[in-house]
UniProtKB/Swiss-Prot annotation:
Subcellular location(s) of the protein: Plastid, Chloroplast; Plastid
Domain of life per record: Eukaryota
Basic and acidic residues: compositionally biased ranges: 56-69, 295-308
Protein name: Protein REGULATOR OF FATTY ACID COMPOSITION 3, chloroplastic
PANTHER family: MITOCHONDRIAL 28S RIBOSOMAL PROTEIN S6 (PTHR21011), SMALL RIBOSOMAL SUBUNIT PROTEIN BS6M (PTHR21011:SF1)
A GO biological process held by the record: regulation of unsaturated fatty acid biosynthetic process
Disruption phenotype: Decreased leaf photosynthetic activity, reduced accumulation of plastid rRNAs (both mature and immature) in roots and altered root plastid gene expression leading to small plants with pale-green leaves. Abnormal intracellular distribution of plastids. Altered fatty acid composition of membrane lipids leading to an increased oleic acid (18:1) level at the expense of alpha-linolenic acid (18:3) level among total fatty acids, especially in root tissues.
Assembly and oligomerization: Interacts with CFM3B/SPRT2 in plastids.
Gene3D superfamilies noted in UniProt: 3.30.70.60
Protein purpose: Prevents non-specific action of the splicing factor CFM3b during plastid rRNA biogenesis to improve the accuracy of plastid rRNA processing. Required for plastid functions such as photosynthesis, intracellular distribution, plastid rRNAs biosynthesis and plastid gene expression in roots. Involved in a sucrose-conditional process important for the organization of root lateral and apical meristems (e.g. establishment of RAM from pericycle and symplasmic connectivity), and subsequent primary and lateral roots development. Modulates C18 unsaturated fatty acid metabolism.
Entries under NCBIfam families matching the protein: S6 (TIGR00166)
Matches recorded under InterPro entries: Ribosomal_bS6 (IPR000529), Ribosomal_bS6_sf (IPR035980), Ribosomal_S6_plastid/chlpt (IPR020814), Transl_elong_EF1B/ribsomal_bS6 (IPR014717)
Ranges for region Disordered: 49-73, 214-314
Length: 314
């Protein structure tokens, strides 16, 4: 009996103390050492709950609106606002006022100029369309502009001078449709652009010139060649046609005449034109002596020499 009382008192003295601060621990879950219990009882694990530490960071989240925060439904003016797109299909930014827009355009132009300074070049082209393809002028112009747009080029000026009379016939055409255009494109595409005009049989002539800057002002067509020549009292339209017909025949004769003319400088500093001609047959015998004296100055082909003094720069 005394042994039982002694054992019960020892168990009571070993119960854990639970004060008010740790009152959240459940005493029923605290198990004692099995060596202090009855003999033959199963060992029980000791389980204790840990105290959670509170975060010292303050939570400033608040559902109330700040003074500078907009409230209410989303403005329909922003949802339904029409967006503007430029010529190249890019979305234009929104500007607060005209001054901000002007500043943006200036900075964008300066940036593009710096980036494309070494790649982009300005050119001017004049091309003539055959008169029998007068109805296809618009399609030809569209073809050229589409090519420039494909190569990221830009057209600065486009002038349609219409049908004009040619100074001379080209591919049996007396008139042609004139087009003047200033454009900007990378230098590596210039030969390809010229090939585009060369491959089109409707374009009978074209001329491409390099420019230092973009030209945008309108350029009126110059007066026609025949209207200018009409004021010349010595101008004859029929005579010009005859000259054009005999132009090919006269080219060979001019070349032969040029071969028979030479220029020399005499002792006095005068320029002497020496004209060589074929030696005539049937010359008189009385001139034989003079011919022998002049024979020293003749060329080996037996041509006659005629000298004439020509004033140069006088």
């Amino acid at each position: 009996m005394e042994s039982l009382l002694h054992a019960s008192s020892s168990l009571v003295s070993l119960r854990p103390r639970i004060d008010g601060r740790d009152s959240f621990i459940n005493p029923s879950r605290v198990c004692l050492n099995p060596s202090l219990g009855r003999r033959g009882s199963k060992p029980l694990p000791l389980v204790a709950a840990a105290k959670k530490k509170k975060s010292k960071k303050d939570d400033n989240h608040n559902f109330s609106a700040r003074p500078d925060e907009a409230t209410g439904p989303f403005p329909e003016s922003i949802l339904l606002k029409e967006k503007k797109i430029d010529e190249e299909g890019d979305l234009l930014p929104e500007f607060a006022d005209a001054e901000e827009k002007e500043l943006y355009q200036f900075l964008d132009l300066q940036l593009q100029s710096d980036l494309n300074e070494e790649r982009m070049r300005h050119y001017e082209v004049v091309y003539l369309i055959h008169e029998k393809h007068a109805e296809e002028v618009e399609s030809i112009n569209q073809k050229v502009q589409d090519y420039l747009k494909e190569k990221k080029g830009k057209v600065w000026r486009f002038s349609d001078w219409g049908m004009r009379r040619l100074a001379y016939k080209i591919q049996k055409a007396e008139n042609a449709h004139y087009i003047l255009m200033n454009f900007e494109i990378e230098a590596k595409y210039l030969n390809e652009f010229k090939g585009l005009l060369d491959s089109d049989e409707r374009v009978i002539r074209h001329l491409v010139m390099k420019r230092d800057e973009a030209i945008t002002e309108d350029c009126p067509p110059p007066p026609e060649f025949h209207s200018v020549r009409a004021g010349d009292e010595y101008y004859d339209d029929d005579e010009e046609e005859e000259i054009e017909e005999d132009e090919d025949e006269g080219e060979g004769e001019d070349e032969e005449d040029a071969d028979n003319i030479e220029y020399e400088v005499d002792d006095d500093g005068n320029v002497v034109m020496v004209l060589y001609g074929d030696e005539e047959e049937g010359e008189e015998e009385e001139d034989g002596a003079s011919e022998q004296e002049e024979g020293q100055d003749k060329s080996t082909n037996g041509r006659r020499e005629t000298r004439r003094t020509v004033n140069v720069g006088g």
